[in-house]
Design a protein with these regions (language model features):
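C-terminal helical "tail/cap" subdomain of flavin- and related membrane-associated enzymes
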Residues: 213-215, 273-416
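A conserved beta-strand/loop element that lines the FAD pocket in flavoprotein oxidoreductases
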Residues: 12-29
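Glycine-rich phosphate-binding loop signature in dinucleotide/nucleotide-binding domains
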Residues: 17-18, 53-60
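FAD/FMN-dependent oxidoreductases across multiple families
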Residues: 174-292
């Protein structure tokens, strides 16, 4: 992606004599403030620190776009700013840039990657030839261990290049035994016991000793909270300069629903539409007279108002969509996974029986590209409300049948 971005920058600079792009690496944001320029438009002053020598650099811009990840320095600067130096939709409040966080069943899971050779072979049963893997196929390899701290699952996602190295994701709870092993030989022996069919032995094994050592020493990363920032854009008093956030700087969540990249790219599309004075959802000319202006302030205000509800719905989908797909091995996880699977299956069956009157679960609805995240969660909420009414109604009928109206009068104090 970095190489592709560099190629796009070079292509842009070659086609335009002015407004060239300067690509700077090794700097991190320290502070962001609006500045007043006499005789010309105001600008945003960005103070950046060189990560190697600590030297400070000043950059001026009309618009600053924060796309610096879930621990965004740009967002943090806005969250610690004075409430008087910026404006925003319905007034600027630094608290709006402090992300709201929720813990999902997938939050805090640890993940690291083991590199397998391309087209490696999976041993089959005795007397059967091994299965040669293909890059375009998905594979899930389960260990013989089934305990809450030693169960392993090797997940391999499809790849276009059949000759490329196959990375396999190791996703576990933080207390898993694999995180207590820090040298290659011990890690190889652990995997050999967990996957006895695979030739993980030292001489001629499917994985090199160098890779085992790298994998054992790797710390990996952790899945984040489900979080989002209510604030996504600000501007100064004059409305001629501002800041906008996109991608993980606005929203971050575990990769359960497979929408992280799509959501980040959609932020860029929405910001582009807003800066062009278009409706951020439809991409069409706005029909509201008050929003037809195309100044930077009105465009950023449009970007703040329209995507914010969509982002909130996205985070709700991430919390409840598919948090148990990693086969978390704790006993409570296994019970919850069965309940989640039953819930998804029940929704799907009832949707078929009622010809779509009852909607499938939100994770299945999210696969319909024509639906926005708000529409997905609205349909899921309607189905949940329907179930609640049915349960309460059924319980009421059972109580009436079992105890009669006298019991209801006593409990609720209602005159029938």
């Amino acid at each position: 992606m970095v190489k592709l971005m560099a190629e796009c920058i070079d292509e842009h600079n070659a086609q335009h004599e002015s407004c060239n792009i300067t690509f700077v690496m090794g700097q991190e944001c320290v502070d962001i403030l609006p500045t007043k320029n006499v005789g010309q438009s105001n600008s945003v002053c960005v103070t950046a620190r060189n990560v190697e020598d600590g030297s400070l650099h000043i950059h001026h811009a009309t618009l600053v776009v924060g796309a610096d990840g879930m621990n965004s320095k740009v967002r943090q600067c806005l969250a610690t700013s004075s409430s008087t130096i910026w404006n925003s939709h319905k007034g600027f409040s630094p608290k709006k840039f402090e992300p709201k966080r929720w813990t999902s069943p997938a939050s805090h899971l640890r993940i690291k990657v083991l590199q397998l050779p391309p087209q490696f072979e999976i041993p089959d049963g005795e007397g059967k030839p091994p299965i040669k893997t293909k890059g375009e196929n998905i594979y899930a390899l389960r260990s013989i261990n089934t305990g809450p701290r030693n169960y392993l699952s090797l997940g391999l996602l499809p790849m276009k290049d059949n000759t490329a190295v196959r990375p396999t994701n190791i996703v576990t709870r933080p207390d898993h035994e694999v995180w207590t092993i820090h040298d290659g030989p011990s890690m190889r022996q652990y995997f050999q016991k967990a996957f006895p069919r695979f030739p993980f032995e030292k001489d001629g094994g499917v994985i090199s000793e160098e890779e085992w050592d790298r994998f054992a020493k790797a710390q990996g990363t952790r899945f984040p909270h489900c979080q989002y920032s209510e604030g996504v854009a600000v501007w100064d008093d004059s409305g001629t300069c501002g800041v906008a956030l996109v991608g993980d700087a606005v929203h971050a969540f575990p990769p359960d629903i497979g929408q992280g990249v799509n959501a980040g790219l959609m932020d860029v599309v929405c910001l582009d539409r807003a800066l062009k004075g278009l409706d951020t959802v439809t991409g069409k000319e706005t029909t509201v007279e008050s929003t037809k202006e195309k100044t930077l302030q009105t465009n950023l205000e449009r970007y703040q108002k329209q995507p914010a509800p969509e982002i909130a719905a996205l985070i709700r989908l991430a919390r409840f969509g598919a948090p148990y797909q990693y086969n978390q091995p704790h006993r409570a996880d296994r019970i919850s996974e069965k309940m989640w699977t039953a819930n998804v299956a029940l929704h799907l069956i009832l949707s078929k029986l009622t010809f779509g009157l009852i909607q499938p679960s939100c994770i299945l609805l999210s696969q319909k590209g024509e639906l926005t995240f708000r529409q997905v969660m609205r349909r899921a909420d309607l189905t949940t409300a329907f179930f609640k009414v049915m349960v309460v109604g059924g319980l009421g009928l059972w109580v009436r049948q079992r105890f009669g109206f006298g019991f209801l009068k006593t409990v609720f104090g209602v005159m029938f």
